């Protein structure tokens, strides 16, 4: 086993040893503890599980100062950003608690026994039930909202599934601190032992995916790492679902009318979006399509001017810095891509990098230019008309988001919108894609390579659906039915009865 060390990205120096990498025996023990906790957690009422989630939210909030201090030391994301992220993290738990109490996530459905044109139909009652223990992989870029206390963990616990988290190496101290806070809160609120576990190290993560009691995996990270784990999950003797959120280029299109109407405003919005969090958002607009006319050139010039004035930023880890710098060097050998602008030089210490801007044309757009690059850089792509734009978008991989900056009643936008809708899980109009709201209507997903499963979202209340499976009770006596499927439930939920939606009476 090796030491798991917390490193300060501002200096690149180790700060403390947090833990040791987790061996196979310990992974096995944690998974078996999760398996023992699974039926206990599943048997808890919705109200009881909601209380667990609220206890976690309150415990994290109570330790806000300590969490933000440690997370900032490990990520250099800044206290303002991290305070906002912790607020979001606590809000997620509260929202999932409310979703449990409301109950529609169960998709409770009753078809009473009846005569049909196909003959007699038995009494059928169906709803979603917990899948079992879930493995969650923390993300590098969100030490809170997509890590140990993040949305995958919150949605799995809400669904009634124990969780074993693989901590990310970029912020092990933050992960351990949050884990300790959460375990204590869950225990005090009445959760069974084993409901939450944590492992460290890549080998432990792989062992987690292979372990026979793990029934699903939630992952946010790189395309390369995600594909390896996806293949691992698929090659098990009993393949399990792997819900991976991977690479995303997130195209943003500025229409000719929008460029002409508000060039400076659009430029400021684009720069703010692709540099937010040092450009380390999976929803960062990595390709910006501008019309090849006077207005489009004005937007491009304003973006370049803003980039030139930007100070360097600190990235999360050495690997991200290495890949970011390599991407810039590769452009020297690519005649189709031009270096448009660069901000102030990087600091000599730590994982500092300058903000950068690249440029190409729709006709010259290459595969390399459409690959995600973490960090504060985007590629401007100029297009000469609708056909030119369509041809370029056809080269762009499917993404988590696609953005359209347009004017009202613009026919050009009407033509582009269906193209963008087909290639992303979320279509953004006259806004910027970096923010991802926690809500019932959110889709944070998309077709490969954005994710491994286009049917689900990793953000919002319906993220629970990934960790639930449908079960139908046929001709079951009332005493053996879940409360939500009984004729007279103690705690009613929205149900579809004989094909019609029936809401509880309040």
Mark where each language-model region is.
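Short loop-to-beta-strand entry elements in the cores of soluble alpha/beta enzymes
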Residues: 52, 161-174, 195, 238-256, ...
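C-terminal core of ALDH-fold dehydrogenases
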Residues: 347-353, 386-481, 503
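Extended hydrophobic packing segments that form well-structured cores
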Residues: 484-506
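NAD(P)-dependent aldehyde/semialdehyde dehydrogenase
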Residues: 268, 290-400
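Structural signal for hydrophobic packing residues in well-ordered secondary-structure cores
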Residues: 38, 42, 57-64, 68-71, ...
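Rossmann-like NAD(P) dinucleotide-binding subdomain of oxidoreductase/dehydrogenase enzymes
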Residues: 61, 105-267, 271, 289, ...
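N-terminal Rossmann-like NAD(P)+-binding subdomain of aldehyde/semialdehyde dehydrogenases
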Residues: 1-122, 505
């Amino acid at each position: 086993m090796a030491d798991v060390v917390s490193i300060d990205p501002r200096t690149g120096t180790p700060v403390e040893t947090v833990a040791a990498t987790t061996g196979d025996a310990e992974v096995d023990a944690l998974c078996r503890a999760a398996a023992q906790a699974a039926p206990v957690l599943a048997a808890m009422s919705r109200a009881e599980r909601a209380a667990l989630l609220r206890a976690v939210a309150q415990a994290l909030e109570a330790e806000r100062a300590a969490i933000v201090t440690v997370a900032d030391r490990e990520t250099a994301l800044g206290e303002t950003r991290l305070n906002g992220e912790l607020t979001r993290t606590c809000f997620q738990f509260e929202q999932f608690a409310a979703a449990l109490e409301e109950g529609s996530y169960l998709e409770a459905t009753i078809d009473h026994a009846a005569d049909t044109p196909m003959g007699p139909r038995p009494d059928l009652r169906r709803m979603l039930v917990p899948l079992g223990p879930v493995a969650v992989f923390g993300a590098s870029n969100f030490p809170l909202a997509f890590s140990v206390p993040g949305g995958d963990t919150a949605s799995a616990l809400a669904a009634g599934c124990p969780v074993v988290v693989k901590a990310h190496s970029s912020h092990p101290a933050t992960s351990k601190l949050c884990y300790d806070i959460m375990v204590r809160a869950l225990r005090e609120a009445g959760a069974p032992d084993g409901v939450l576990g944590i492992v460290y190290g890549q080998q432990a993560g792989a062992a987690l995916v292979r372990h026979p009691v793990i029934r699903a995996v939630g992952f946010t990270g790189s395309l390369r790492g995600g594909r390896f784990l996806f293949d691992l999950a698929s090659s098990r003797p009993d393949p399990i679902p792997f819900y991976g959120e991977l690479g995303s280029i997130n195209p943003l299109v500025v229409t000719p009318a929008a460029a002409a109407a508000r060039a400076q405003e659009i430029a400021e919005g684009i720069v703010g979006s692709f540099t937010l969090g040092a450009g380390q958002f999976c929803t960062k607009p990595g390709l910006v399509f501008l019309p090849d006319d006077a207005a489009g050139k004005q937007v491009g010039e304003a973006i370049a001017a803003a980039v030139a004035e930007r100070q360097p930023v600190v990235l999360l880890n050495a690997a991200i810095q290495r890949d970011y710098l390599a991407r810039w060097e590769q452009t020297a050998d690519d005649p189709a891509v031009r270096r448009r602008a660069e901000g102030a030089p990087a600091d000599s210490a730590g994982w500092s990098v300058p903000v950068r801007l690249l440029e190409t044309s729709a006709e010259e757009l290459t595969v390399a230019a459409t690959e995600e690059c973490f960090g504060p850089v985007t590629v401007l792509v100029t297009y000469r008309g609708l056909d030119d734009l369509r041809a370029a978008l056809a080269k762009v991989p499917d993404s988590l988001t696609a953005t359209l900056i347009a004017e009202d009643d613009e026919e050009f936008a009407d033509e582009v919108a269906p193209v963008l809708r087909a290639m992303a899980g979320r279509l953004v109009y006259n806004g910027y894609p970096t923010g991802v709201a926690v809500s019932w209507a959110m889709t944070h997903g998309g077709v490969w390579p954005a994710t491994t499963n286009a049917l689900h979202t990793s953000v919002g209340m319906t993220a629970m659906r990934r960790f639930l499976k449908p079960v139908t009770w046929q001709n079951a006596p009332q005493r053996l039915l879940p409360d939500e499927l009984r004729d007279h439930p103690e705690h009613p939920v929205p149900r579809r009865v004989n094909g019609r939606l029936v809401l509880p009476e309040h």
